[in-house]
Amino acid sequence: MILGAFLATLNQTIMSVATPELMVDFNISAATAQWLTTGYLLVNGILIPITAYFMQRFTTRQLFLASMVIFLAGTIVSAVSTTFPVLLTGRMIQAAGAGIIMPLLTNVIFTIYPPNKRGAAMGMVGFAIIFAPAIGPTLAGYILENYEWELMFYGMIPFTLLVIIFGFIYLKNVSEQVITKMDIISVILSTIGFGTLLYGFSRAGSEGWSSSEVLVSIAVGLSALGLFTRRQLTSQNPLLDLRAFKYNMFSLTTIINIAVTMVMYADMMLLPLYLQSARGYTALESGLLLLPGALVMGFLMPITGRLFDRYGAKWLSIIGLIITIITTIGFIDLTDSTSYTYLVLMSTGRRIGMALMLMPIQTAGLNQLPSSLTAHGTAISNTIRQVAGAVGTSLLVTVMTNRTETHFKEMMSTGGNMAGQEHMIIEATIQGINDAYVVIIGIGLIGLILSFFIKRVGQVSEEDSGAKIQKVMIKET
């Protein structure tokens, strides 16, 4: 299962380096190319709420094998694609399979291990998953420099087949099946809500925030999610049991996770764009720059897990966010002559900060939930993280695009001429990226402030959970 999650994560990270080249090959804008990432995260965000139902309805073995087969189908479609719409379709099919894997893996960990050992277990999972971003950009860079981009997908096919074969032979079931009826109305509301909301954020990059298309999409999305939330809170068999938010540490860490995820995913988009589009570095050089930080991050994850089991998440989160914010400040004054070594050091520092807080924050919230809500809590946590990543990426690309345009107009109005237009475009792009990093710092500060309120709490028993939910239902009626 960890190997399957590794492949899904690897597939997601290789696109950050490939985006600039795909923009040229398909003659598309950054806002359009961003859909390869946003669309992937969007499908994850739509599908993951349903995984809580899937994890109860199907066995671990059935669900994992089905998700890997879907992922394989999407990989094949992406590999043979010759147009951007076909490539995007393949990516979304991949996302449908990948969206099931991580919630399923997390749920298995929380089923097998007691609360006082989950940090170390999640740390080992984190090591395997973080190793994918460590080699993903470098591997993608090497392929793009020496071969065609299609090889990134063709190369994944045999490994996915091996995971399916090994899963079929060795994977055992660890959860009990619960036969329940799927709430189709909830599925429709969830799909419309997350789909239109993310579409609105993505279109804002090219259409602007005053566009009626953007405003209507966001309004429809928020309305549908409001109806979805109401239905989950009043249903006897909710698709996604939102009563998990009645547990204070789960709610708090979920909000912090939103901020942390937006900071992490946005940087995965901005730095490759700066390196390749503004500085002229190759895809391989861009990937190599990200390699040291990702390797250090992967190495620290198991250590962080053990520290969490011993000390809790509060100070790991605070220290991690402080390091992340300080090193992100180093990215707000980039120029066309910023040294490669400086970028490596700042990027590595950001990854160290991320390693200290990612798994502890998620594990701290899920640890409080009773066993009956673990699957729902896992699905909620992963849904929000995926949506936050997509919204964060869309928001930061919007900021970068709009600020780049503003800076370019200012340069032209202060004596710029057509002869130096190419240089001004590069300079305006760099300044737009700097402005986007300022927004990242602001989001990180919100997460830092909230981290001071994290407390170490134990898992709520099923008896206490039942009493708490009964009180909630009485209030609702």
Model-identified regions with their sequence ranges:
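Helix-loop junctions on the cytosolic side of multi-pass membrane transporters
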Residues: 165-186, 207, 230-239, 402, ...
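Short, membrane-exposed interhelical loops at transmembrane-helix boundaries
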Residues: 412-432
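12-transmembrane solute porter fold
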Residues: 1-10, 15-19, 26-31, 36-37, ...
